């Protein structure tokens, strides 16, 4: 951590690395419009407070997707442990919605949209090893 910014974010300079720990997202198209999110823990929100929901909504709104989607999120990454579990789930949702509805977005396109969900979500779209600076974007 380099410093705390006036907007509440921390300015960072760090190496980020993906690891073999993951949650499971399963997506299916629905004929009824909307986002139907089910999570395996009752204390995790399944509405617009959830980053998976936000990611799905972001793309579905932008591309005016008329169908709905059913998303099942099974959490294995510890919640609020600083391991980017929510961010990686959001990234997976972006990739999944892009594929499911054949939106044709590239990885770069997804990364550009991902920053609207969270600072480290673009990295989670990219995966691998990266130097993160600024607020982590």
Task: Enumerate the predicted regions with their spans.
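Short, small-residue alpha-helix embedded
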Residues: 87-101
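Alpha/beta catalytic cores of group-transfer enzymes, especially the acyltransferase/condensing modules
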Residues: 104-137
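A broad detector of short, well-ordered amphipathic alpha-helices
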Residues: 53-54, 91, 112
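Generic structural signal for isolated residues within well-ordered alpha-helices
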Residues: 58, 96, 112-116
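ATP-binding N-lobe of GHMP and related small-molecule kinases
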Residues: 1-81, 99-108
């Amino acid at each position: 951590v380099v410093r705390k910014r006036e907007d509440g974010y921390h300015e960072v300079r760090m190496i980020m690395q993906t690891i073999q720990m993951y949650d499971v997202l399963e997506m299916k198209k629905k004929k009824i419009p909307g986002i139907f999110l089910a999570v395996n823990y009752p204390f995790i929100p399944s509405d617009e407070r959830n980053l998976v929901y936000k990611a799905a909504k972001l793309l579905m709104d932008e591309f005016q997707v008329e169908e709905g989607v059913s998303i099942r999120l099974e959490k294995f990454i510890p919640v609020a442990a600083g391991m980017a579990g929510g961010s990686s789930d959001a990234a997976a949702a972006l990739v999944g919605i892009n594929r499911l509805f054949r939106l044709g977005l590239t990885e770069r396109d997804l990364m550009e949209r991902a920053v609207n969900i969270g600072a480290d979500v673009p990295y989670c779209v990219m995966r691998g090893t990266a130097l993160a600076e600024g607020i982590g974007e």
